[in-house]
Amino acid sequence: MSVVVYAPASIGNVSVGFDVLGAAVSPIDGTLLGDRVLVELGSEAFTLATAGSFVDKLPENPKDNIVYDCWCVFSRELNKKNVALKNVHMILEKNMPIGSGLGSSACSIVAALDALNQFHDNPLNDVELLALMGEMEGQISGGIHYDNVAPCYLGGLQLMVEELGIISQEVPCFDEWYWVMAYPGIKVSTAEAREILPSQYRRQDVIAHGRNLAGFIHACYSKQPELAAKMIKDVVAEPYRERLLPNFAKAREYAASAGALTTGISGSGPTLFSICTDKDVADRVSRWLQENYVQNNEGFVHVCRLDKQGSQVTGSKL
């Protein structure tokens, strides 16, 4: 018996909701923009193999891989429930560039924990599993946060609430939106991107941030796509992180001139997203970004839609 789980890319923050909003996305051409993890019965307690486009970026020692840490915390939780742990052999297919702003670590974490849970007949519920995912994300970035793991696991646009035992809740979004995702092929570490942020903010920025986020959520629920797009502005991180992203300002300017509704930084970058309502506009923006924002052959551009499913079992073989 074996199981394979695919976990999609995600946009942390979605510009307007620093650390509290996240959206899962998938290319419209069917490309799997995300990681896959296979779990099968093993001869030892834990073994790990790696594969995929970005396998050379992973640590050589399996015990330095986040998938091993996922297995450790999953084992811990099963032990608490007195559920027997099976010997597992796992394969991580690493298709997501590391430090890309596409929720790369979240993809590996979500795929690994979801696959382990599926393989053991789902002893952990969604909230328990999501809590572990946040714990693992915190191990990498230095603080527990859910804005990538929640949409990656649950799908859609997720708002982190973290009250009453609820970690996140889905916010209705707009099916007609195309999300053009452009990764230039360079790395920006989440830790570095956090270090350049100020420790205190001016009152007017706090007010603007509250207005933008409240306005965006209201527009999503009241089905006002133009207003929602107008509210996607970042006063918390983008003004400080722009300098880490070569050509970001030019890309945003071009996208606006081509008809995109808004452009922002995905997570801590360097990936950007542009939202368009017209497929021709999305294709035009995509072509420009491919020629002017992508810097090497590791970079890519995809026209995406919101991925409403999140992580999913794709079969029993990679």
UniProtKB/Swiss-Prot annotation:
GO terms for molecular function: ATP binding; homoserine kinase activity. Pfam families: GHMP_kinases_C, GHMP_kinases_N. It comes from the Bacteria. It catalyses: L-homoserine + ATP = O-phospho-L-homoserine + ADP + H(+). Coiled coil: none annotated. InterPro entries: GHMP_kinase_C_dom, GHMP_kinase_C_sf, GHMP_kinase_N_dom, GHMP_knse_ATP-bd_CS, Homoserine_kinase, Ribosomal_Su5_D2-typ_SF, Ribsml_uS5_D2-typ_fold_subgr. The keyword Membrane does not apply. ATP binds at residues 97-107. Pathway: Amino-acid biosynthesis; L-threonine biosynthesis; L-threonine from L-aspartate: step 4/5. HAMAP family: Homoser_kinase. Catalyzes the ATP-dependent phosphorylation of L-homoserine to L-homoserine phosphate. Belongs to the GHMP kinase family. Homoserine kinase subfamily. This is Homoserine kinase. It comes from Aliivibrio fischeri (strain MJ11) (Vibrio fischeri).
